[in-house]
Amino acid sequence: MQCPVLSTTEARDEAMLRSIRLTAPAAVVAGLLFSTTALADDPIAEKAKLCATCHGEQGVPTQKNIPVIWGQNEGYLIFQLRDFKSGARKNDLMSPIAAGIDPNDVNAFAAYFSKLKWPNLQQAPAPADVAAKAQATAASVGCPGCHLAYFQGDGTTARLAGQNHDYLLKTMNDFRDKTRGNNPGMSDLMKATSPEDIGALAQYLAGLQIDQYLNQGN
């Protein structure tokens, strides 16, 4: 029986997953690194070092389909970690790692990463025609109603501006086909959005640089 041919992205993800599994089972790694017994005296920053394996030591993810978590909104991070722990959100890498996080550390991890500076991924701004299409789609769907004017998000709503392009594209499509099921409202909105419009949104949001606007009040 012939094995299915993996796309470049799928092959890269599989290689990363295999590497981590060969080093140690993810659940064991999580248990060792996040156990309050093993690391009771260590600061949360020490425990967070595992996260850099995928999310990057300076906040720049090691792969294009991995999200930025540095500077992400604290409430959003809390909800996603809880959803990974409960199984409401599933991912081959994150699910077993989140399962090993002490429940008492979930809020601390979210607070820690939310206070770090959002990195510039050096993603090019969308061309004018793509930006116009994306802005029209965002207005039609009502994205700014939750993600705010600069797509910076707030509270339990994610920042989208400057997020990894491939992650944005995959996430919106996962909501659309309900592969990701921890936000039914987003699934409904993306189901009503065409793949072409989703592509424009991903390109537009990835290229947004908003720090200058967010810092105006400081």
What are these regions (language model features)?
Residues 14-26:
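Bacterial N-terminal signal peptides that target proteins for export
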Residues 35-37:
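N-terminal signal peptide c-region/cleavage motif recognized by signal peptidases
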Residues 40-58, 126-149, 164, 218:
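Sequence/structural segment immediately N-terminal to covalent heme-attachment motifs in c-type
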Residues 44, 59-89, 95-100, 139, ...:
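Gly/Gly-Pro-rich "capping" loops immediately C-terminal to redox-active cysteine motifs
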Residues 50, 76, 93-96, 108, ...:
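Extracytoplasmic/secreted proteins, especially bacterial periplasmic and envelope-associated proteins
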Residues 60-61, 115-129, 149-159, 176-183, ...:
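Inter-heme linker and motif-flanking segments adjacent to c-type heme-binding CXXCH motifs
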